[in-house]
Curated annotation (Swiss-Prot):
The protein's assembly and partners: Interacts with cognate CdiA-CT but not non-cognate CdiA-CT from E.coli strain 536 / UPEC.
Lineage: Bacteria, Pseudomonadati, Pseudomonadota, Gammaproteobacteria, Enterobacterales
Protein name: Immunity protein CdiI
Note from the entry: There are 2 cdiBAI loci in this strain, this is locus 2.
Origin species: Dickeya dadantii (strain 3937) (Erwinia chrysanthemi (strain 3937))
Function statement: Immunity protein component of a toxin-immunity protein module, which functions as a cellular contact-dependent growth inhibition (CDI) system. CDI modules allow bacteria to communicate with and inhibit the growth of closely related neighboring bacteria in a contact-dependent fashion. Protects cells against the DNase activity of CdiA, its cognate toxin protein, but not against non-cognate CdiA from E.coli strain 536 / UPEC.
């Protein structure tokens, strides 16, 4: 499994970089590869590890960690900068006031949209989602 800092450092990496090439060895599984409709996005899904890498123009743009099993992904068990059982209020106590928030309601087309908060840093954005029971369910690092 990868350390949190290693995940953050992967943002912006090329798919030709050693960090990306050796991911299957570090996660002990081969990814399922899908290409976006327009061909500018690639998805590398490590279902057993609960990790999804989104690449745009062959660079790592987002890394999603499925804290709860969902969409065919197992629960991510690797390192996180916050407790896995956290509620939104607990994360805000640890990280401070988020730079943005939304969701937490039904959408006519999408169904329930998870509540989310995000934090922007100089190097990345941390997007955190909560399920209908206010439990942490997904953490996404974005460039």
């Amino acid at each position: 499994m990868l350390a949190w800092n290693n995940l953050v450092e992967m943002l912006g990496c090329s798919k030709a970089s050693n960090e990306f090439i050796y991911l299957p060895q570090k996660l002990n599984e081969l990814p399922v590869f899908e290409e976006g409709v327009l061909g500018d996005r690639s998805y590398y899904s490590f279902f057993n590890s609960g990790v999804l890498f989104l690449l745009e123009d062959d660079l790592v743009n987002q890394i999603s960690l499925y804290i709860q099993a969902d969409e065919g992904f197992s629960a991510y068990t690797g390192e996180l900068p916050l407790p896995v059982n956290s509620r939104e209020s607990e994360i805000i106590q640890v990280l401070g006031t988020p730079s943005g928030s939304g969701g937490g309601k039904m959408d006519m087309l999408l169904g329930y949209v998870n509540r989310w908060i995000k934090y922007k840093t100089e190097s990345h954005t941390l997007h955190i989602q909560f399920d209908q029971n206010d439990q942490l369910c997904r953490v996404t690092l974005m460039q």
